[in-house]
Amino acid sequence: WGEPDVLFAREGSFCRQPIQVLASGRWIFANWLCSDSASGLAGDPTAFQISDDQGCTWRTVEMPGSNGRVHANVVELAPGRLAAFMRSRAADFIYRSESLDDGNTWSEPVPTVLPNNNSSISAVKLQSGRIAVAYNPTHTPAPQPGVAAWPGLRCPVAVALSEDGGLTWPMIRHMELGEGFVGSE
């Protein structure tokens, strides 16, 4: 092994998902740009590192209107059409954004019907084409507008399925109903 190289020098780059290889061969790496603040919401936009040469060079694409929408999970709905699902620092809902051009531009995130208490989520495309999201289906009680609400109980755990790229979620199953974990980040 040689000396490690800095892949992304921008301070505050934070990720939770692996690099994904799209049908086009493009690499996309979802992250968010964390900065210190008293409210926990000083920017914190979602961004994507994109490479068209297998990681030799990268460029950054920021998602508009994404402050406080973090830990994007990118799902390739069809070649060139992507959806990103994010947890909410406001502890209200899971948010969704879409790209119709292989990640070059993104829509502003909009809330889904799935609640979120600012705990991590995981979204994947199944072989059937459905989208599955694992999450904690709770809100944080009485969050303050403009201030990050930190997760409380991380239970129950549920999995929701969508047949339309994450626009609707008609199938939800609670997988773990136990007392869960009360944590701070």
What are the roles of these predicted feature ranges?
Residues 1-185:
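Asp-box/BNR beta-propeller blade signature and adjacent active/binding-site loops
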